[in-house]
Amino acid sequence: MSVKGKGFPLDLGGSFTEDAPRPPVPGEEGELITTDQRPFSHTYYSLKNDGIKNETSTATPRRPDLDLGYEPEGSASPTPPYLKWAESLHSLLDDQDGIHLFRTFLQQENCADLLDFWFACSGFRKLEPNDSKVEKRLKLAKAIYKKYVLDSNGIVSRQIKPATKSFIKDCVLRQQIDPAMFDQAQMEIQSMMEDNTYPVFLKSDIYLEYTTIGGESPKNYSDQSSGSGTGKGPSGYLPTLNEDEEWRCDQGGEHERERECIPSSLFSQKLALDSSSHCAGSNRRLSDGREFRPGTWREPVNPYYVNTGYAGAPVTSANDSEQQSMSSDADTMSLTDSSVDGIPPYRLRKHYRREMQESANANGRGPLPHIPRTYHMPKDIHVDPEKFAAELISRLEGVLRDREAEQKLEERLKRVRAEEEGDDGDVSSGPSVISHKLPSGPPMHHFNSRYSETGCVGMQIRDAHEENPESILDEHVQRVMKTPGCQSPGTGRHSPKSRSPDGHLSKTLPGSLGTMQTGHGKHSSKSTAKVDSGNLHHHKHVYHHVHHHGGVKPKEQIDGESTQRVQTNFPWNVESHNYATKSRNYAESMGMAPNPMDSLAYSGKVSMLSKRNAKKADLGKSESASHEMPVVPEDSERHQKILQWIMEGEKEIIRHKKSNHSSSSAKKQPPTELARPLSIERPGAVHPWVSAQLRNVVQPSHPFIQDPTMPPNPAPNPLTQLVSKPGARLEEEEKKAAKMPQKQRLKPQKKNVSAPSQPCDNIVVAYYFCGEPIPYRTMVKGRVVTLGQFKELLTKKGNYRYYFKKVSDEFDCGVVFEEVREDDMILPIYEEKIIGQVEKID
């Protein structure tokens, strides 16, 4: 049963037409039917063979790329060819559609000659080397040479190497036509396309749009491939169709032309806008109350046009709108309405979601096909193995050198740390941290530091050296003298730890104030001495100087204050201990003790100053009043603090040199009071800047830190002090000596009679740095100091000139500053000091 007429092939290539035949009835797949002649008033297809009998099977559209000519029922769909194009360049060039799409891309990039030259070389190589075709091969070789190789401005000629050009030229001139004469040039062009144009093509808009719409976009050429069908139909997504409108071919053409003008980046946005306008139009029609029922079209969806990448309206609207149009309550129960007849939108949400999923499965409009990432061979795979091995070896050697350098650096750092730890081990063999053994009581954040100091005095601590506290002090002084290099303490630092030898606690301290006997016997003196000697905390062998000269309070006032402090019964914990240590360290860091030996002997003399009568107390008050300064502006107050700090430090050095003190006086002084005022409590014992520091705890203790204009100091030694003018120091010392009573002046000489004499193997080094008015002072081991050792003391490295003061009769003044240039030269000594000037070389 066949008739002659205008027929059209059934292979539509996945395109949709309104005249497409329906799928056959099961069991009649092999029956041949004829296509009826129909008038196509608005069709897109150009029908070619008029009057030719066209007999086809309506079972399955023919697919010439398959073995059987069609896809068997139940078989899985193969990978689309446009996804195989991303595997390699050869996969792209083996497919006709891929070649057309790639050529279109190259034409847009003005480099289509690359692909033409590649195919020309392939065709030339396939020519049979017969004698009859020699002339044809020669003409073809000359044409390829003139069009692509000889033209120096062409893109192919620019990509071919000069050696390859000369080889092809020689072959053409000598007429030695070889089928492989263009192979080298073809490989160079192919390599260039694989590295440049092919990856760019895979990321281009034309390829991405082609894969997104399921391989329909580029089929608008006049020369279609064999698998593309013979007709030119609408390609890509179908336009959005509202419920009350009818789709027309010319409307689809308008949408198609509009889509071609839209970039691929804006294509998805247009779909979203179309979808939203569709929903808005549906809601508008519902609100107007119009009822539209297009008819009873209940045929199932054509399975041959399902899952082709069409993205029409949303899934629920596409399927459920058809079902709702058939019902009588389509206007009141439409799912596009947010209220759904007054039912809250959150009710039966799971049920609606399930229905939406079922509708999606029924429509078959799942997500768009997945585009796999392109897998390319590594670029280094074409490298010569010898070059690759050489480059790899050089890189591995570089890595090995870096690792060896890191290992050497780590070893050096370990040695430096071991040396530092060895120095620390010589000083403290068994450190005892009091703050770690204290019971955890409730923290007291707001209290005066003197209360914590008093609580520390009131403790009973048992020591391994309980019967001989002088040995602790002697050993401590010897250890500190061996290692003078350390940092001076301050309130800004952490709480220093106890480094007394074998000074561990036999039992933890109680949470409140310890009770002590109120008698004036020997046991009271011992226990009190133990407390102070056990609480000598040091931060890396630091000297602590306790200022205890000046006036004291009357005895009645001291008794009243001590009674009040005992009645407060505040807990002694880690926080209070830290505050006490910080307050003591502040007074000690100011350098207020006469010398280091005096500060150590102070711990054994708990109540030495309590013997003074009211007359001496008044004298001390007047003396302390003479030290107080009037209220001055902030800058002048800072400078005054610095000057007073310098003078006090120099007084301590002079006292340390002139007097030999002993710590044995700690035993000989009988205590008269248990609770004695400490240096911070006594009004005459604190200098004006210390009093200001106690009033304003926020300010740092170091005077230089308060002034941001001052340069930062290097880390000083424990004996480091700033040097001031000798005349001012001597005058201040004479004034103090004149005011001090005779008995008090003789006391320092009586203290350290039994103490060992301090070795004098250190020398003072002071230097003025780059014209600064205040010199830097430090102590260096040994009496012989070279210029190289002096340079190590400088914290700022650079090109300097070094001048040192020495005695000379060359000038009237008797002294000169001599320049020293060699690092091994010994520096001159002037008045038991090395005084130098460091000047920067411009």
UniProtKB/Swiss-Prot annotation:
GO terms for molecular function: beta-catenin binding; I-SMAD binding; identical protein binding; molecular adaptor activity; protein homodimerization activity; protein kinase binding; ubiquitin protein ligase binding. CDD domains: Axin_TNKS_binding, RGS_Axin. One of its GO terms (cellular component) is plasma membrane. Its main location: cytoplasm. Residues 1-75, 218-242, 277-297, 316-344, 414-451, 482-532, 543-562, 615-637, 656-675, 729-754 are annotated as: Disordered. Residues 760-842 form the DIX domain. One of its GO terms (biological process) is negative regulation of canonical Wnt signaling pathway. The keyword Cytoplasm applies. Residues 348-433 are annotated as: Interaction with GSK3B. Residues 34-46, 316-339 have a biased composition (Polar residues). Gene3D superfamilies: 1.10.196.10, 2.40.240.130, Regulator of G-protein Signalling 4, domain 2. It holds the Pfam family RGS. ADP-ribosylated by tankyrase tnks and tnks2. Poly-ADP-ribosylated protein is recognized by rnf146, followed by ubiquitination at 'Lys-48' and subsequent activation of the Wnt signaling pathway. Ubiquitinated by rnf146 when poly-ADP-ribosylated, leading to its degradation and subsequent activation of the Wnt signaling pathway. Keywords: ADP-ribosylation, Cell membrane, Cytoplasm, Developmental protein, Membrane, Nucleus, Phosphoprotein, Ubl conjugation, Wnt signaling pathway. PROSITE patterns: DIX, RGS. This is Axin-1.
